[in-house]
Amino acid sequence: MKTIKVTQIKSASHRLKNHKLCLQGLGLRRIGHTVEVQDTPSNRGMINKVYYMVSVEE
């Protein structure tokens, strides 16, 4: 399955609880942290929710 590189570029403090949980679900812990996740509809949904805090590379 295809993978996506996701990097956190903004802080999660003072954000909505659901958005913090999405970052946690993606495996992101801090600014500058990069993870590779599989390209699934659930991961895409989490990325779309926190689009303003992450950068995505195909």
Curated annotation (Swiss-Prot):
Short name of one Pfam family: Ribosomal_L30
GO cellular component: cytosolic large ribosomal subunit
Molecular function in Gene Ontology: structural constituent of ribosome
GO biological process entries: translation
UniProt entry keywords in alphabetical sequence: Ribonucleoprotein, Ribosomal protein
Domain of life assignment: Bacteria
HAMAP family assigned: Ribosomal_uL30_B
Similarity comment: Belongs to the universal ribosomal protein uL30 family.
Quaternary structure and interacting proteins, as annotated: Part of the 50S ribosomal subunit.
Protein name: Large ribosomal subunit protein uL30
Natural source organism: Acinetobacter baylyi (strain ATCC 33305 / BD413 / ADP1)
Gene assigned in the entry: rpmD
